[in-house]
Curated annotation (Swiss-Prot):
This is Glutamine synthetase leaf isozyme, chloroplastic. Pfam families: Gln-synt_C, Gln-synt_N. InterPro entries: Gln_synt_N (IPR008147), Gln_synt_N_sf (IPR036651), Gln_synth/guanido_kin_cat_dom (IPR014746), Gln_synth_cat_dom (IPR008146), Gln_synth_gly_rich_site (IPR027303), Gln_synth_N_conserv_site (IPR027302), Glutamine_Synthetase (IPR050292). Expressed in leaves and stems. Low levels detected in roots and nodules.
């Protein structure tokens, strides 16, 4: 018998040839995960994950997990996904659907025990799931699907953690629809070693070298978790998520992926689906996913969720003037945005490590130390988009995107407030 061993620090994967009917992520990719100890950075001993032999339970389970049921039945598996009681955790459960579907309206509503997720009292615990968006399931393959849902009381009222409902109202406003709001969201995240709550690739209880060599790097001494990032990238493309790129971040063990441009409510649906997929992949890899905006105190970058935003008017000739008016509105609602941009963001927005101070609104061209950054191409072309650098990595994309649309398209400041803000920000609007 051969033992499969896992360290508490460095690891790397060995890919083997998948079964012909294997789905993208449940194939031998993860079952052949090979863990290697980094003796230079950790004295931790190997721990036994499993004992494997030719006729092992692992091999038999793998065969069942990789079954392609499509030739044998029209039925599919739908994984219903919703946001839990913390507002950042994702929950899910599966059900059988009689045939493949093309639209969430073809799916039945469902329910769950809200008392077990912190979303309902025990004496009235039923919460109803409304299917809102569907994606291909990269774990099961075939016609199986992931279903993004929002949650309601039995009376049809959105529960407090259902932020999608309010966002859908904003994005269905005719004034917002006419402006076709685009969003490009940069989701940063940190990978942690299981059981020690310490970044992947870091010596347990210690620190790597200072920041500098890690951003967009390659090499076993600089890049930690690339296989997870790449597996997530491909799984999102398979699912139909509008993922547009990925890169290693400034802090070692931290990564980023980008979703968009997406229109309106779609941006939130795609981010939540991508987060769920990332949680599942890190689960299979034995690594913990953290969306904490400042996972490590000290001279280390935090984790944000920069949100790029434009409207039809911003993208057309003369759009830079529209962008400046939007910046003015955002400055006047700075407190409202900060309060909705993620838990613990005050630990990240310090004015250091490519952030602006949480207490002061600022904007600039190509300045990553500002609240709102405008790219040089936008300034040069006189049209384009703005980047809101304030949202934390654990922000709710439904809240952030709808608030941007509301503040720039639906909310009107008083003339006096507008004039004072324009003078303060040196904006001629």
């Amino acid at each position: 018998m051969a033992q499969i061993l896992a360290p508490s620090t460095q690891w790397q994967m060995r890919f083997t040839k998948s079964s012909r009917h294997a789905s993208p992520i449940t194939s031998n990719t993860w079952s052949s995960l090979l863990m290697k100890q980094n003796k230079k950075t950790s004295s931790a001993k190997f721990r036994v994950l499993a004992v494997k032999s030719d006729g092992s339970t692992i091999n038999r389970l793998e065969g069942l997990l990789n079954l392609d049921i499509t030739p044998f039945t029209d039925k599919i598996i739908a994984e219903y996904i919703w946001i839990g009681g913390t507002g950042i955790d994702v929950r899910s459960k599966s059900r059988t659907i009689s045939k493949p579907v093309e639209h969430p309206s073809e799916l039945p509503k469902w329910n769950y025990d809200g008392s077990s997720t912190g979303q309902a009292p025990g004496e009235d615990s039923e919460v109803i799931l409304y299917p809102q968006a569907i994606f291909k399931d990269p774990f099961r393959g075939g016609n199986n699907i992931l279903v993004i849902c929002d949650a309601y009381t039995p009376a049809g009222e959105p529960i407090p953690t259902n932020k999608r409902h309010r966002a859908a109202e904003v994005f269905s406003n005719p004034r917002v629809i006419a402006e076709v709001p685009w969003f490009g969201i940069e989701q940063e995240y940190t990978l942690l070693q299981t059981n020690v709550n310490w970044p992947l690739g870091w010596p347990v209880g210690g620190y790597p070298g200072p920041q500098g060599p890690y951003y967009c790097s390659a090499g076993a001494d600089k890049s930690f978790g690339r296989d997870i990032s790449d597996a997530h990238y491909k799984a999102c493309l398979f699912a139909g998520i509008n993922i547009s790129g990925t890169n290693g971040e400034v802090m070692p063990g931290q990564w980023e992926y980008q979703v968009g441009p997406s229109v309106g409510i779609e941006a939130g649906d795609h981010i939540w689906a991508s987060r769920y997929i990332l949680e599942r992949i890190t689960e299979q890899a034995g690594v913990v996913l953290s969306l904490d905006p400042k996972p490590i105190e000290g001279d280390w970058n935090g984790a944000g969720c920069h949100t790029n935003y434009s409207t039809k008017s911003m993208r057309e000739d003369g759009g830079f003037e529209v962008i400046k008016k939007a910046i003015l509105n955002l400055s006047l609602r700075h407190k409202e945005h900060i309060s909705a941009y993620g838990e613990g963001n005050e630990r990240r927005l310090t004015g250091k490590h490519e952030t602006a101070s949480i207490n002061t609104f600022s904007w600039g061209v190509a300045n990553r130390g500002c609240s709102i950054r405008v790219g040089r191409d936008t300034e040069k072309n006189g049209k384009g988009y703005l980047e809101d650098r304030r949202p934390a990595s654990n922000m709710d994309p439904y809240v952030v995107t709808s608030l941007l649309a509301e503040s720039t398209l639906l909310w009107e400041p008083t003339l006096e407030a507008e004039a004072l803000a324009a003078q303060k920000l040196a904006l001629k609007v």
